[in-house]
Amino acid sequence: MQDLKHVFSYLKPYRRDLFLAVGLVFVECIFEMVIPMLMSDLVDQGVPSHDMQVIMLQGSKMIICAVLALITGLLYARFAARAANGFAAALREAEYRMLQQFDFANLDHFSTPSLVTRMTTDVTVMLNAVATGLRPLVRSPVMLFMGLGMAFLLNAKLTIVFLITTPILAAILAWIVTKVGPLYDRQQTAVDHLNGRVQEALTAIRAIKAFVRGDYENEQFETVNDELAAASTNTFRYAVLNLPAFQAVMYTAIVCIMWYGGNFILTDRMTVGELTAFLSYVLQVLNSVMMFSGVFLQLTRSLTSARRIRAVLEEQPALATPADPIAAVADGSIDFADVSFKYSAAAARDALSHVTLHIPAGATVGIIGGTGAAKTTLVQLIPRLYDATSGTVKVGGQDVRRYSLAALRDAVGIVLQKNLLFSGTIRDNLRWGDPNADDETLWAACRAACADEFLERMPDGLDTDMGQGGVNVSGGQKQRLCIARTLLKHPKVLIFDDSTSAVDTATEGKIRHALAALTDVTKLIIAQRITSVMDADMIVILDDGKVHAVGTHKELLANDTIYQEIYASQMKGDDADGKGIQR
């Protein structure tokens, strides 16, 4: 219940609408409670004597009460809808804001499809709990106690008959809830799996088409779809027992009341009108119990969703800004002091092991190594996307953990291995680097990244629509736009994570020439091609998470066997310094 309490705390801004809705339910119940008493007078006084005045008067009162109950019901719907939708919007916003604070380590705890489900399906469950569950939650106990009170006033002995049904109904409800509760967890997990399959298929739709794997993907989707159908069917199988079981008990109680009530009428201990009113109250009481059982099942499902939502809201970011942070990075110098790192405490071995490096400000550093050498892992520690497990990473002479996260990451520009662009225009995407950049600044960055070559051929230039995920440009064009976007940050440290692999060597040469002019920026270039790093001030060779060698192109070519092997496998040339290369 603590999960529900925590999640429902987001209803606080909508307490006025909530209280008005609850009050209107009370008023509606009062009007509905009056109607059977009016009907009793009509049956006992108006019908036997054929007194039309009594019939019209009591009938008019019943109609007025019914209309007023309808109006209060409609007003309730308005206020409840406003509270429920505001509550759902607040939940989604809180979850999304928390996601923006998550670090990579936090995101490792949740799958992307699960996070999507928690922000959509689970929030919708909570919305429905308020929008459709509030009325019966308030109405059922009010109708129950008011109905019991009115029935007791009419005939105390007859009231005992349907009071006997209460423990029976409670036992049925308890049994159903114990069965259904765990099944809702499985159902939501199945929704996660379905969303994951759909997301993966849509993301990789071009590969699916290229490899003609549509039938295979259909089979994979059918598997998770069947899993969801089976989980939903199992849940429904128990939840649906609620209505017929309660109806069976309810109708049995009504038959008993009719039999005993008929005897009371025959012995002049009760009138026909009183029995009619009594039956109305009995139906209201039993319906309220049925409503309450439905609300209980809804709350059981809401509890599952609340637990999943709370897990996101209470996830503590793995990285945090210190209490008294350094607000600016002095320069682009970088130091790794005996740094080791593993992605999780349970990992069997370190991804990086005892790395020690000094990179002066303004230097150009190439980083090479085989697949899995931890090149990307190394540079991710610089903007503090992860914290080192042991050792110290410094930028600008200060431990990265002493900086404000925003200040540190603003000072570090990363061109990712995977080129990420967003829906919108090219201008919108470039302004991620500098929201206030004018067209002249944007074009200057594009020229440095050689993106102007294709932008000038586009009719709309910077206003060209990128399409979803940048589908309207090629891989090489994406890379150049990503480079331009990062240059617009004017960072002190610039990291290229194999980010020129999709451009031709001539274009790469132009980009390297433009970057060479950025003498006050420290540049780290992760590359597979020797030509991308051979002019660097320093080349770092990583092997299995360890620094194998550090030196210039000439030094490594003369002294390091791994570098010599990489060089020999990629090119043939006349000079050991790499000049006169034939490609």
Language model region names:
Residues 327-583:
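ABC-type nucleotide-binding domain
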Residues 13-16, 104-105, 121-130, 134, ...:
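An intracellular "coupling" helix at the cytosolic face of ABC transporter transmembrane type-1 domains
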Residues 20, 35, 39-42, 76, ...:
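Extended hydrophobic secondary-structure segments
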Residues 49-50, 85, 93-117, 121-123, ...:
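Short intracellular "coupling" helices and adjacent cytoplasmic loop segments at the cytosolic face
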Residues 13, 17-30, 41, 65, ...:
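Transmembrane helices of ABC transporter permease
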Residues 1-35, 39, 47-63, 72, ...:
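Membrane-integrated ABC transporters
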Residues 35, 39, 76, 80, ...:
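Hydrophobic/aromatic residues in alpha-helical transmembrane segments
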Residues 50-57, 150-164, 234-308, 312-313:
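Helix-loop-helix
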